[in-house]
Amino acid sequence: MQSVLVLDFGSQYTQLIARRIRELNIYSEILPYNTPADTIRTHQPKAIILSGGPNSVYDQTAFMPDPAIFSLGIPVLGICYGLQAIAKHFGGVVASSNKHEFGRSKILVEQQGDNPLFQNIPNSDVWMSHGDKVMQLPEGFRATASSDNSEICAFESTGVNSPAHIYGLQFHPEVQHTLYGKEMLGNFLLNIAAITPDWSSKSFIEHQIEEIRRKAGNNTVICGISGGVDSTVAAVLVSKAIGKQLHCVFVDNGLLRKNEAEKVMHFLKPLGLHITLADSSDLFLKRLKGVASPEKKRKIIGRTFIQVFEEQIHHEKFLVQGTLYPDVIESISVKGPSETIKSHHNVGGLPKRMKLKLIEPLRELFKDEVRAVGRELGIPEDILMRHPFPGPGLAVRVLGSLTHERLEILREADEIYIEELQASGLYSKVWQAFAVLLPVQSVGVMGDKRTYENVLALRAVESSDGMTADWAPLPHDFLARVSNRIINEVRGINRVAYDISSKPPATIEWE
């Protein structure tokens, strides 16, 4: 399978570059900006893309790629900072510009001579995000596009006193605001690099089945399954590879949505998985009694989950995890692991403690690709399009201390909210939606009597990957209907609010 390497210089758009490449049915990987050329050679890429970044190439601490990558004979495309890094390396002049360019800008494409990167692309709007610019081209390079504020918006090497097939774009072709960005990437990858677009869900599945069989051999494998998209797709893919060697465990921690355990077991049954239901709800709730701190809740739930999961491990040698590519990128990127905002509840501590070897069949995929693989595997759409649900469950949606009564209040209210979203055709239009029971009571009037009851918040967000999110502008009449139903049908709530915070600065979940 032919591939492209994206070297990460710290751009907020690096993952987007990789995703745009995959949309062209070409496999892409992200590596740190300083990956040695010898390492790159072992990957045998057909092209290299240098991402943007927040730094200036003329700073003493500027990030620069291994110079030897330009001698590999592989086409290279620099984007924004990547263009400037190429210009500096080959002797061009890069400096701070008096006129910064941020947002939309119109470029003029050079029409004289051959211009393969801009083949069949007219003058058009692009997305700029730079304060520095190339003041003077290196020897052996020519400008191929310009804007009002930048005479050099794009360039290419001529192959005379410079290597062949080195290209640069000062703007961001990966961003949707660049009207012909996908076509530019297509020109570079399909025409200039002559890559065969052979990356697809089907080819991925075929490759992973071979890898899983090779890795697992005749050993038994265990998988914690939650009913969410990632764990379900991972389990079905592994099951397709090794069949009855896979043992799945669904842990009921007492913090699930209304009838969640029964629903999950019901819709997973037709998928042919061997699943054990471990009902440990009493144990979880006993240990969480009186605990109000969200971080303490997460830690208790995490430790208890490991204990319960450990009891289900017998002779298994491997553990399946639904790790996705953004998790992998986070650990190897130029920025390194981000500051921990919340501790994450998963079974990440199990392999070291239990001496289990990992099988991570989805570690090369983004979220949308996981769903595409799920469709190829025949997993029903209503499973694939389920909204994300946090590992700690309702423990982080009932703010403050947990009680059976408060959990039941939230379950009833949340079910009404989701039911109305589905009935209105809105469920599939938002990334995630849920209710939150606040540790606040308010005065109300019901039946001419004073009430002093709980406040509930409704949350719905729009996102593509959960890394950033905007609050969803749900119709007012819809919110009024949901609020009216909850207050009338759920005993213990007399006020409903709607959360209009985006991420950042807020997180999607409240705790």
From Swiss-Prot:
Keyword terms of this UniProt record: ATP-binding, Glutamine amidotransferase, GMP biosynthesis, Ligase, Nucleotide-binding, Purine biosynthesis
Active site, renumbered: 80, 172, 174
Gene responsible for this protein: guaA
Official protein name in the record: GMP synthase [glutamine-hydrolyzing]
Pathway: Purine metabolism; GMP biosynthesis; GMP from XMP (L-Gln route): step 1/1
Positions with a binding annotation for ATP: 226-232
Domain GMPS ATP-PPase: 199-386
Glutamine amidotransferase type-1 domain sequence ranges: 3-198
Quaternary structure and interacting proteins, as annotated: Homodimer.
CDD domains, per the entry: GATase1_GMP_Synthase (cd01742), GMP_synthase_C (cd01997)
GO cellular component: a single term: cytosol
Species assigned in the record: Chlorobium chlorochromatii (strain CaD3)
Signal peptide stretch: none
Keyword ATP-binding in annotation: yes
Known EC number: 6.3.5.2
